[in-house]
């Protein structure tokens, strides 16, 4: 079976009625994306995705183990407890990638010393108590996926579990690869994969925050600063060069606003954390920096997307989910749009320049765990330059073709100079979706009828003219055509948006139309009408978390975090109803795994996905997957061995016991 399981036996989802075949390829306008074969069906090791080692979030490791790392070193041969029940939920599988050398280089591997730094890119992902490291993914053609049975390094933690991690791409080089790892008990570990003696632990005594780390990110173009978010809803700024405080930190209020507050740490000497952000209600699930590094988008369990200007700590935008929490967020390559996914089963596209929801996408049957823009098929920059040059697009579109496997029409390639944003989503329903956000959806629409606004709320008033896309599209909007757009019909004007038939508009699925007539509180009360399958709605247990530092989780000073009233927000510019914004249909929607999907990355030559079972899938872009003969013919042009030599693996496996504390290598 290929990595990702194209021919696997029936899993739990099949037993619950989900008998859809797992796909090994899918087709878009540009051609076929194909799943690269792998040498392993799953990673090797005793830990099962269904029987993890129980985490210990409330008991810090005692004695010397507490001082040496986030957990005491556990023997590699000790299996986790097994039982008939599902056991505690594992943290979501996450994948981090660092690129060494020029991704578009001539094909020669970067010169690096032997060991973990040898070769090109590096991939890290967590599964249960373990961290795995592999050689990188395809660059300019590859014939195989990652061999999950041959990690070049592995770390095992006891008493706590890795929940997230991030490489420092800015400083990555042949002599250093910096990695941050967050844990379920709240600690953060700093590692250098080449300098084995370099290791630091932050929040070791859990004095800063006792809840799990939900997300980590290095500040753009920074060698030492990083952000860590926690299930407490707090976001902390750290410097790897500074130690942590030996007592619970004290804070002074710097700034507060709608649903957030920012504090500076009181300390005469440089200490971590440097600052604390209290954002929203409930866990802060994920955050992302804009491409220019100036703005920070945060999504929380309270269902709000908040966009901050990072340096000034000002709230620049606010959006509310249609229902439930938001779990993931991503910026468009040009920084104009933000896409989110969450517990409403929808993907939502929010315009940063206009401060409004421009579209929603309905294709998933359960929560959306990951979203990402594809910068390699997005045409926004080409369209902007063509519009600026005044070059009218007179090319005719290619004739519509039909997919051989489904018989459904495949939309032609968009005209040169047109605006097309491509993004993807991965959900707990094991479905992978691709979406095209086209110019006809992005064109300005009349104001929403009967739309209320909350005075003083960011996002309620669109920015001044000049931020509208009308001036960027050049020769006016394209004719509305469903063959070129993956959006369902929506009202051309706002005059009838609040009419009696608006809630059951033709073309909108029944479930969505029904939700359009309910307030969020009404949906919450109708537990008997839940549409989620039990298996797919295991939920975001690993993302959530309760408890915390009883004295430190309370906001210091008179800065309470306000909560938006869902009943009042629905139908406003912060949260339009379903029929008030375009509803996108997925360009591609395929079942690609047996377990819920948690990872989605777009690279130059491939797409990377991963599921909670610990399987990494590499999907080669059209024309980028070579056969054995083609790979041999192109040797020396654009490819090099993706697996380390035997001596490299042996060198890693025989490292002395002086490796970073809390690990077994």
From Swiss-Prot:
Primary localization: cytoplasm
UniProt keywords, alphabetically: Acetylation, Cell projection, Cytoplasm, Methylation, Nucleus, Phosphoprotein, Repeat, WD repeat
WD repeat residue numbers: 208-248, 279-318, 321-360, 363-445, 592-629
Tissue: Widely expressed in brain where it localizes to the olfactory bulb, forebrain, thalamus, hippocampus, cerebellum, cortex and hypothalamus (at protein level). Expression seems to be particularly strong in areas of high synaptic density such as the glomerular layer of the olfactory bulb, and mossy fiber terminal fields of the hippocampus (at protein level). Expressed in retina, with strongest expression in the external and internal plexiform layers (at protein level). Strongly expressed in brain and testis.
Superkingdom of origin: Eukaryota
Biased segments, Low complexity type: 65-76, 450-491, 653-665
Amino acid composition bias (Polar residues), ranges on this chain: 634-646
Modified residues (N-acetylalanine): 2
Subcellular location: Cytoplasm; Nucleus; Perikaryon; Cell projection, Dendrite
Chain intervals with Gly residues compositional bias: 1-11
Region annotation Disordered: where it falls in the sequence: 1-91, 100-119, 380-413, 446-506, 524-564, 628-665
Bias (Pro residues) ranges: 52-64, 77-89
Modified-residue entries (Omega-N-methylarginine), positions: 543
Function: Regulator of the deubiquitinating USP12/DMWD/WDR48 complex. Functions as a cofactor that promotes USP12 enzymatic activity.
Subunit structure: Component of the USP12/DMWD/WDR48 deubiquitinating complex. Interacts with USP12; promotes its enzymatic activity. Interacts with USP46.
Name this protein carries in UniProt: Dystrophia myotonica WD repeat-containing protein
Organism annotation: Mus musculus
Gene that this sequence comes from: Dmwd
């Amino acid at each position: 079976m290929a990595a990702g399981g194209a021919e696997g036996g029936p899993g739990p989802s099949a037993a619950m009625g989900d008998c859809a075949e797992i796909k090994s390829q899918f087709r878009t306008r540009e051609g076929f994306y194909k799943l690269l074969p792998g040498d392993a069906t799953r990673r090797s090791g005793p830990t099962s995705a269904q029987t993890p080692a129980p985490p210990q979030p409330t008991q810090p490791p005692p004695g010397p183990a507490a001082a040496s790392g986030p957990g005491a070193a556990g023997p590699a041969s000790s299996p986790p407890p097994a039982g008939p029940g599902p056991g505690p939920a594992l943290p979501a599988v996450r994948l981090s990638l660092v690129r060494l050398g020029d991704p578009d280089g001539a094909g020669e591997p970067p010169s690096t010393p032997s060991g973990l730094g040898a070769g090109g890119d590096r991939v890290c992902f967590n599964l249960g108590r373990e961290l795995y490291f592999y050689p990188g993914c395809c660059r300019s053609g590859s014939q195989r996926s990652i061999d999950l049975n041959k990690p070049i390094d592995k770390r095992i933690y006891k008493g706590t579990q890795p929940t997230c991690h991030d490489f420092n791409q800015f400083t990555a080089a042949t002599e250093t690869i910096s990695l941050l790892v967050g844990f379920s008990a709240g600690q953060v570990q700093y590692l250098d994969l080449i300098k084995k003696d370099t290791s630091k632990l932050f929040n070791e005594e859990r004095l800063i925050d006792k809840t799990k780390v939900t997300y980590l990110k290095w500040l753009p173009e920074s060698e030492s600063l990083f952000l860590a978010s926690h299930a407490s809803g707090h976001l902390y700024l750290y410097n790897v060069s500074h130690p942590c405080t030996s007592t619970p930190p004290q804070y002074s209020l710097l700034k507060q606003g709608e649903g957030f507050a920012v504090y500076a740490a009181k300390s005469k000497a440089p200490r971590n954390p440097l600052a604390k952000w209290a954002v929203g209600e409930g866990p802060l699930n994920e955050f992302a920096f804009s491409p220019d590094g100036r703005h920070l988008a945060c999504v929380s369990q309270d269902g709000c997307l908040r966009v901050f200007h990072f340096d000034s700590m000002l709230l620049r935008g606010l959006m509310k989910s249609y229902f439930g929490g938001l779990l993931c967020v991503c910026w468009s390559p040009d920084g104009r749009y933000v896409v989110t996914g969450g517990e409403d089963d929808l993907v939502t596209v929010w315009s940063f320049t206009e401060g409004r929801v421009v579209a929603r996408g309905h294709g998933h049957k359960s929560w959306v765990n990951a979203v990402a823009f594809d910068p390699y098929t997005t045409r926004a920059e080409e369209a902007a330059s063509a519009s600026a040059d005044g070059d009218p697009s007179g090319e005719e579109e290619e004739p519509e073709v039909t997919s051989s496997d489904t018989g459904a029409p495949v939309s032609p390639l968009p005209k040169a100079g047109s605006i097309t944003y491509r993004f993807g989503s991965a959900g707990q329903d094991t479905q992978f979706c691709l979406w095209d956000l086209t110019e006809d959806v992005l064109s300005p629409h009349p104001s929403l009828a009967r739309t209320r606004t909350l005075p003083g709320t960011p996002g309620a008033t669109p920015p001044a003219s000049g931020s509208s896309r009308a001036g960027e599209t050049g020769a006016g909007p394209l004719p509305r055509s469903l063959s070129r757009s993956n959006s369902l019909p929506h009202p051309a004007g706002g005059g009838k948006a609040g009419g009696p038939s608006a809630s059951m508009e033709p073309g909108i699925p029944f479930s969505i139309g029904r939700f359009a007539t309910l307030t969020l509180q009404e949906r919450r009360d109708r537990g008997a009408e839940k549409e989620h399958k039990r298996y797919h709605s295991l939920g975001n247990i690993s993302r959530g978390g309760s408890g915390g530092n009883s004295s430190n989780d309370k906001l210091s000073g008179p800065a309470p975090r306000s909560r938006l009233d869902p009943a009042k927000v629905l139908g406003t510019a912060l949260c339009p109803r379903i029929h008030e914004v375009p509803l996108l249909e997925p360009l591609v929607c395929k079942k690609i795994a047996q377990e819920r999907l948690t990872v989605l990355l777009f690279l130059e030559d491939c797409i990377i996905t991963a599921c909670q079972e610990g399987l990494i899938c590499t999907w080669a872009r059209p024309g980028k997957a070579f056969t054995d003969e083609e790979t041999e013919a192109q040797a020396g042009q654009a490819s090099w061995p993706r697996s380390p030599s035997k001596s490299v693996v042996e060198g890693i496996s025989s490292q002395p016991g002086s490796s970073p504390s809390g690990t077994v290598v």
